[in-house]
Amino acid sequence: MRLNGKTAVVTGGASGIGKATAEMLAEAGAHVLIGDLDETNGAAVAAAIRAKGQAADFSRLDVADLASVAAFKSAADALNLKVDIVANVAGWGKIQAFMENTPEFWRKVMDVNLLGPVAVTHAFLPGMIERNSGKVVTVSSDAGRVGSLGETVYSGAKGGAIAFTKSLAREVARYNINVNCVCPGPTDTPLLAAVPEKHREAFVKATPMRRLAKPSEIADAILFFASDRASFVTGQTISVSGGLTLAG
């Protein structure tokens, strides 16, 4: 699956699934613009990609801040990048009982996991419409399909991202723009590493394949949706979860 001549935005590209996605899209031939709050690691990922003779840039991005999203879009314009692919990978969550949540917690979860993809997509979609072509791939979660204990608001946000994907796909299909969603199961990322060991063990036990996903396995699905191999696929959600949601 080649992306030669394409330009891709990858949010959350400094680590985990986002990093794997940026590396994979660049390897496939795309010019990648990485956005992340972590400027040190984000710039390092872009530099490592360039060191392999591939094209990558980095610009700071807080998907939960509309001003930051606007500045990120301006950075893309300053680089004269005509974005063909938006990969909404940035996410945040914390296992916590719903009755222990605060309104501030709700807002952060919703702003990063739902409104972040909405804002970034809204910023780059006009160019895709103008060129009558584009791909939007949003990383949701199987929590958004079947729920997850201790992740009630997170599950709601991720479920919203799935619904956003389906509705937007209907709206922009006339412009030859594909909009799809990838739902990872528990994945070996820095975010999951912060989860207590007992919860990680429970995730593995609940997964028929009895292991965590590798970030590259999620990136594989993102690459498919971003490529011409998925030219007639839109509004779809695929779980990459080792069978965790067989009935989902």
Model-predicted segments: where are they?
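Substrate-binding pocket helix/loop in short-chain dehydrogenase/reductase
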Residues: A97-F98, T102-R107, L192, F203
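Residue(s) in the substrate-gating loop at a strand-loop-helix junction
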Residues: S141
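Canonical Rossmann dinucleotide-binding motif of NAD(H)/NADP(H)-dependent dehydrogenases/reductases
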Residues: R2-L33
